[in-house]
Amino acid sequence: MIEIFGKPQCPFCDRAVSLCEQRGYEFTYKSLGTDFTREELFESFPTARTFPQIRVRETENTWTYIGGYDQLAEFVKHGDVWTD
């Protein structure tokens, strides 16, 4: 499961969603102001400075931080896969 933290009118957020849809990955999209606040974003991603912020659930209680869209694209390009 991929979790994408994005914001409205963010081209890289849209690209991350499109990439997940094209690859058939299960994902959730959370939008700033609707699903989380900036404060909550910084609690989960203290070094975040751009959108989107993306993580992958490895196990029920374990998340691996991927980064932004470019890092997600590299992750997918190298054939890294995960299970839900």
What are these model-derived regions, one by one?
Residues D14, S18, E39, E74:
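Alpha-helical elements of the RecA-like P-loop NTPase motor core of helicases
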Residues R23, S44-F45:
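Residues at alpha-helix termini
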Residues S31-D35:
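Short glycine/proline-centered loop/turn elements that form peptide/ligand docking sites
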Residues F45-R55:
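Structural micro-motif
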Residues V56-D84:
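Non-catalytic, surface beta->alpha helical segment in thiol-disulfide oxidoreductase systems
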